[in-house]
């Protein structure tokens, strides 16, 4: 079956949900441009990212790969341009590991560029009235590690397969919880919080569906 692999990170950092995981689940099994979306959850773990992603690509043999993650405070659909071979955490991953000044892979490659049609995706989303932008940093946590790993694996095994990473905003319920916590802690004033932007999950799901459609449009099903 011609397919696209869509991954979404599980909740992390004490958060109850992750819009990336919810979006992946919403689109799993959907047929877009004749390709079936194969959704898979990813633990927020460097160990799991390194082991699971190559295996998923080997098992599914997708025609494209799009990975999803959360960027707290982001107000738009954020299309990542580049993955770098750096791991540097500010908080532990879900294994409890706290990595500083590490590498995603030991192959010496410093960075890899996403191969999704980023400008076309951005234009399609903006035409739909959905805020979107191309970003030149995916950070140095697991989202970047995911992007670099996928691009690294595909460069060696299937360089014709387009792949990339999309960062998503909070959903409104998450921001509501942040504000409640802020009120109860009384440690910060409201204007000091920089992470209170959000987007409805339905709009996020539609945006990712559009990104998939733009990526796959005109591609021949294997």
Regions flagged by a language model, labelled:
Residues 1-140, 151-156, 160, 191-222:
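N-terminal catalytic or cofactor-binding beta/alpha core of small enzyme domains
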Residues 143, 147-149:
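Active-site glycine-rich loop that binds ribose-phosphate moieties when present
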